[in-house]
Amino acid sequence: MENNNSNDNIITKCNRCSISCNQKPLIENLRKSDIMFLGISAKIKEKEDEMPLSENTNSGKLIKMIEERLLEENNNLLCYRSNMVKCVPLNEKGKIRYPDNLEIENCIENLVYELNIVKPKVVVFLGRLVEKHLKKKIMELGYNTITIYHPSYIYVYRKKEIEKYVEESSKNISKYV
C-alpha cells in the first residue's frame, strides 16, 4: 500500500493563489483508501497536526459517525478526508468565507495529485457546492462519486435527523465499497 506521510509534496508547497499565505494547506497523510470524503475548504487549524474534517468540528463528528457505521459492516475499510480547497479562504476581517472560483480552480491540480495516491473506490462530495465544482472532473478521471448533505447543514438545520442522515449516508456509500 502506498503511503506518503511526507510533507514534501505539491500540496504543502502550493502557492498558486493568495490564500496559501493564510496557513499551511490542511491535508491528511496521503494513503490509499476506499472512501474519500471531500469537503469545501480547510478551516483555521487549532493544532499543528490537525487534519481535514477534524473530529473537533461538528462536521468532523458526523463524518466519524458515518465512518463508524461503515466499519460495522466492513472493518477493513480505509477512509480519507480532504477538502476541495486545501487552504483557508479568509475575508478581510479574518473570518472564513466560501472559496471563490479561481481558488477552486487553482486547487484542482492538488486534488488530482491526492486522487492519484488515494485511489478511492468512491469520492463522497459533502454538499452541492463541492459536487457542482468537481463532479464532472472527478468522473472524467474514472472515479465513482456520491453526494450527501454537508454535515454542517445537518448539524445546524436538521439536528433531529442526525441518526437518519448517518444511516442513509452510510447505506448509500456502502454500495460502492
Predicted features along the sequence, with ranges:
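A polyanion-binding, active-site-adjacent surface
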Residues: 2-156, 163-172
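A charged, well-structured terminal subsegment
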Residues: 173-177
